[in-house]
């Protein structure tokens, strides 16, 4: 059973709630990730995802002045590095989100996406399924 520590992306983009949406989106593009972890000091305050950026863009607001705090999902669910991929997938599916911060103690050490979980499942087919050939 795969653990999140083996699947998570450790290239975490971090922003504060007072970061503009444009700056946060640029960070996602540079790092080639779909989310930004929002920190208030050492506290995990929220997560801003591609979907949130799309909602902000569709609102017509000027994203160069609109702040992450307005669009982020506050107090996000998080997972431990020792959580199984299956448990993380269940949490994500039940709650309707695609990104899950991974926290070791109080430190954000990565983010796992539904794509990461799917890729891990494809790399290790379930028992009883024929290998592609």
Model feature map: region roles:
Residues 2-12, 66-76:
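Bateman (tandem CBS) regulatory domains
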Residues 14-32, 39, 79-96, 103, ...:
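The conserved cystathionine-beta-synthase
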Residues 28-31, 36-52, 92, 100-115:
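A glycine-centered beta-loop-beta connector
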Residues 84, 108-133:
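Cytosolic regulatory modules rich in charged/polar residues
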